[in-house]
Swiss-Prot record:
Keyword Cytoplasm part of the UniProt annotation: yes
Compartments, record wording: Cytoplasm
Pfam families: MreB_Mbl
Annotated gene: mbl
Span of the signal peptide: none
Protein known as: Cell shape-determining protein Mbl
Entry keyword rRNA processing: no
SUPFAM superfamilies listed in its UniProt record: Actin-like ATPase domain
Family: Belongs to the FtsA/MreB family.
Gene Ontology CC annotation, any one: cytoplasm
């Protein structure tokens, strides 16, 4: 049995793993539960996520990646090791080649941390590739042609925006404004307006079920429960789409500005291609209601959501591993 090539989308919110010949075989939250007293890892992924906010004092649920980069090296390594062992892709004789994605503007120290975590969890050769490039490939864009393609990849910790041509990034921007910040903004809005404390999972729920960033695009209501800050007792309130648009207005504007900045730095010939082809949205944040309409209105170009936007990066790693020998050597650090 030979080891298989594996592609990893190491996200702030989720880890997805693509195995050559099998497709996406793992999609779990990037969460690790540890015992605070002993430092022992108790659970990883889905099991650990279900413990968030519901554990006794000695058990903490940690998200080892923050804003697209490793915040806790040892725990990231433990998490990767757990996921790779779960797949059983290592054979007795050989270790797998791993392609792992990172945001466009991370430092060489942060790159080294990602590479080492992957090597220690059992990779033979570890390739690093920039996330928006891999997302574009996974979304089916022809990035190796001499024409302009623009991708906006909205993850949990970062939004990566890039214009690509001839298989490389022409202009790009990576900002720490993405899904997690939207959740926090909703949580703070409810706290300010209703004096009600809610958890991260509730605010994500609100975002998905009633949230929109395009004014008037949605009118739904949701009943939520939390703890009253005045009485300390549980209380139920109803929130509507309009309030969430208000709460997320400034955050959405940050993404719009970053996308405008990338377009402004794009050579005119490539800009013309983007007007024809449109901008492709990938990542979990592409599913945020109204983000496509908002970007289309502000950028004055067509905006399309990729098919299965959450899977684009993982699928892209698979395609890149198939063609690893044809890729520019400079890209594979």
């Amino acid at each position: 049995m030979f080891a298989r090539d594996i592609g990893i989308d190491l996200g702030t919110a989720n880890v997805l793993i693509h195995v050559k010949g099998k497709g996406i075989v793992l999609n779990e939250p990037s969460v690790v539960a540890i015992d605070r007293n002993t430092g022992k890892v108790l659970a990883v992924g889905e099991e650990a996520r279900s413990m968030v906010g519901r554990t006794p004092g000695n058990i903490v649920a940690i998200r080892p990646l923050k804003d697209g980069v490793i915040a806790d090296f040892e725990i990231t390594e433990a998490m990767l090791k757990y996921f790779i062992n779960k797949l059983d892709v290592k054979s007795f004789f050989s270790k797998p080649r791993i392609l792992i994605c990172c945001p466009t503007n991370i430092t060489s120290v942060e790159q080294k941390a990602i590479r080492e975590a992957a090597e220690r969890s059992g990779g033979k050769t570890v390739f690093l590739e920039e996330e928006p490039k891999v997302a574009a490939v996974g979304a089916g864009m022809e990035i190796f042609q001499p024409s302009g393609n623009m991708v906006v990849d909205i993850g949990g910790g970062t939004t990566d925006i890039a214009v690509l041509s001839m298989g490389d990034i022409v202009t790009s921007s990576s900002i720490k404004m993405a899904g997690d910040k939207f959740d926090m903004e909703i949580l703070n809005y409810i706290k300010r307006k209703y004096k009600l404390l809610i958890g991260e999972r509730t605010s994500e729920d609100i975002k998905i079920k009633v949230g929109t960033v395009f004014p008037g695009a949605r009118s739904e209501e949701l009943e939520i429960r939390g703890r009253d800050m005045v009485t300390g007792l549980p209380r139920t309130i109803t929130v509507c789409s309009e309030e969430i648009t208000e709460a997320l207005k400034e955050n959405a504007a940050v993404i719009v500005q970053a996308a405008k900045g990338v377009l402004e730095r794009t050579p005119p010939e490539l800009s013309a291609d983007i007007i024809d082809r449109g901008v492709i949205l990938t990542g979990g944040g592409a599913l945020l209601h109204g983000i496509d309409m908002l970007l289309a209105e502000e950028l004055k170009v067509p905006v399309l959501i990729a098919e299965n936007p959450m899977h684009c990066v993982a699928v892209g790693t698979g395609i890149m591993l198939e063609n690893i020998d044809r890729l520019p050597k400079r890209a594979l650090r």
